[in-house]
Amino acid sequence: MTKKKVIIVGSGISGLSAAYYLYKKFNVKIFEQNEYLGGHTHTHTIKINQELVNVDSGFIVFNNFNYKNFIQFIQKLKIKYQISNMSFSVTNRQKKYEWSGKNFKSIFLSKNSLTLRYWRVLKDIFKFNKLTKQYINSEIVSKETVSQFLSSNKFSKEFLDFYFYPMCASIWSNPVGKIKNFKIHFILSFFSNHGLINIIKKRPIWYTISNGSKSYVEKIFKLVGEKNFIHEKVLKINQQKKYIITSKGRKYKFDHAIIATHTDSAKKILGKITLDQKKLLNMVKYRGNTAIMHTDTSVMPKNKNNWSSWNFLNRKKNFALTYWMNLLQNLTIDKNIFVSINCDDKIKKNKIIKKIKYSHPVFSNKTQDIKNKLNEVQGVNGVWFAGAWQGYGFHEDGLKSALRIVKKIR
């Protein structure tokens, strides 16, 4: 019996996982416009003191609380992973203030612990955690924005400036101005689900893939087969006649087309896009960020005791975040490697290893609308939409979106 044809546009976690779960029963073809496979799973092999080391710049960590499908996925692939560190620091150089939640010493034995504003931050962290538990399943705050919720509950400016907004900006790679307009219920759900409201007990264990996240990408590449990965940009999807046209002018027919790209890219390639499809894809916008892999320590906290896995630097116009890759990936090299977002003008040119462009979703107040509209458009004309934008924007969300499609068409 002839296998049905499945075309997958995009080789991020959504596209790759869909390919993995379908390739045995379907004739699967994956199209990727970039030179590398993986999307935000992006590992770079760099040379440090004559030693080659794999460093990630996109997807880095996952945990045992919220990535259950992803853990099952990589365990099936027999991919090794190890415990990581997920500490966080905030630096505000204008106000000569920095803190880290790395350990007991950095929290309670630092110079900051002697200041009133520091204790305001701690007090409001406990207050926010308590309110999250109180409102997580409540309709009372279902329509409130982040800004409205924080104002009505009278959180201190110190809490907002030195904890809450830096944390949210770092998690979603969005500036504070955008975070203020997020739906508060979206934030409360995320903080609760990810154990961020648990100070001591029930904290998630964080992991990183050994030797770089590209390990699972390479495994899927081998299993699905090199011939089924096509490095061509998809220019158009003809929904009525069920074929695609690529940048090389080639035509490929399909029974099912899984669009595992960002929403803005999906809109561009859909020929005769339906009104419902357009409404769905317009619900999630994307904004670009520049990531720089480098060795410049100047963007880190001045006090090295505060160096953490994630390091937020306050800036007037935009957020800046630096990942300390040695700590996150357990790198055993004698040089510190960092990946910074929105720090272009702060990093010395002779310290730069690589620049990478990424786009991240900007979440609106339409979470439930997205789910409802998805149910209406999925599978129409054999076209399916996958992507982390259907959830919180992370690896598990992308994988879950693919699993829902696989369940429907397999």
Predicted ranges, named:
Residues 14, 36, 264:
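Conserved Rossmann-like nucleotide-cofactor binding loop
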Residues 4-30:
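N-terminal Rossmann-like FAD-binding beta1-loop-alpha1 element of flavoenzymes
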Residues 187-243, 247, 252:
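Helical element adjacent to the flavin cofactor pocket in flavoenzyme catalytic cores
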Residues 64-189:
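Mobile amphipathic helical/loop "lid" adjacent to a hydrophobic cofactor/ligand pocket
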Residues 235-361:
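Mid-domain catalytic core of redox enzymes
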Residues 44-70:
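N-terminal glycine-rich dinucleotide-binding loop that anchors FAD/FMN and/or NAD(P) in oxidoreductases
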Residues 100-102, 318-410:
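Conserved flavin/dinucleotide-binding core of flavoenzymes
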Residues 23-47:
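Glycine-rich FAD pyrophosphate-binding loop
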